[in-house]
Amino acid sequence: MNFFNIEKTSESKARAGVLSTDHGTIQTPIFMPVGTVASVKTVHQREIKDDIKAQIILGNTYHLYLRPGMEVMQEAGGLHKFMNWDLPILTDSGGFQVFSLSGSRKMSEEGVKFKSHIDGSYHLFTPEKSMEIQRQIGADIFMAFDECVAYPSDYNQVKLSMEMTHRWLKRCIDWNAENPELYGHKQRFFPIVQGSTYSDLRKISAEVISEAGAEGNAIGGLSVGEPEEELYRITDEVTDILPKDKPRYLMGVGTPWNILESIGLGIDMMDCVMPTRNARNAMLFTWQGVMNMKNEKWKKDFSPLDEFGTSFVDHEYSKAYVRHLFVSKEYLAKQIASIHNLAFYLDLVKVAREHILAGDFYQWKDSVVPVLRQRL
């Protein structure tokens, strides 16, 4: 059984495919909800699977390492059993989170020494340590340990960082070759293209990552503050180089329109905290545009939350009621909004896939993106 099969390519770069893991198949393009600490914020696993219809979720290596810790994780039998989730999981390497701790970490060729945000204790993440933790977590897809630089960054700084990421990749690959899976299911390894917004560095990195021969490849270091045009330009350049027969994962992206544009550039997998984070701040994404549920205009609007929505919350609750919950600072507001946004994101990529299969993806995308961006 191949890990990745392409069902159809479009007239340009968009494609529909299937990822096959030991915990189930994933239809691509796919959006992956983020479950940082073994939970998607405010949402039950049953809702993620049955109502939101997620096919794969993310876990975070840095956060899970610190709490609950790997002793608990291994005694539970891995993350799937710990959180009672029987579908695929992807874990990041912890690199992005560690490098975000700019005031409390020290980097060397060996790895990164950092201070826990929980109790102030010091820890060392090396490529080998990141791989070991991700073995203990047991995700179906796990990522190489990389350095993600801030935007903007000096060219020479980005070049040195990228070269370090490439050296660390070799150490990740060597460790994986010597240390088999722990829980009886296959784990697939993805290295990460870096290089910020410098085209020549991205080209070098994409070629190095392609030559690694991994089962999938990721593009990191984007959606970190660069203009949308740069996000699309770099994504386009990198997908021109990455192997066409391997899945491509664009990390940390993004808005609904970012997602559709990225699919059009040949991306198969995406994740982002935006649907849940924005939901907790009363921002809902819909097929008609973006809604701020605290706005006065919804105060007496008793129509369904979203008549085109796919989740139960869209039809059981009115706009007026959800606005009332937000204004009243009720926890239920965040839960309803999170379920809605995640269900919308999953519906978005599902419909995008249907249009790729139908052969009219680009015409459809160009017509729907301006609508998605408008404020209601």
Predicted regions and their residues:
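C-terminal extensions of enzymes
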Residues: 1-18, 26-33, 41-42, 146-152, ...
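Short, electropositive alpha-helical surface patch
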Residues: 156-166, 199-212, 333, 339
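Conserved, mostly hydrophobic/aromatic
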Residues: 24, 57, 92, 134, ...
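Flexible, glycine/charged-enriched surface loops at secondary-structure junctions
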Residues: 178-185, 358-363
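Glycine-rich phosphate/ribose-binding loops and adjacent secondary-structure elements
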Residues: 175, 179, 188-305
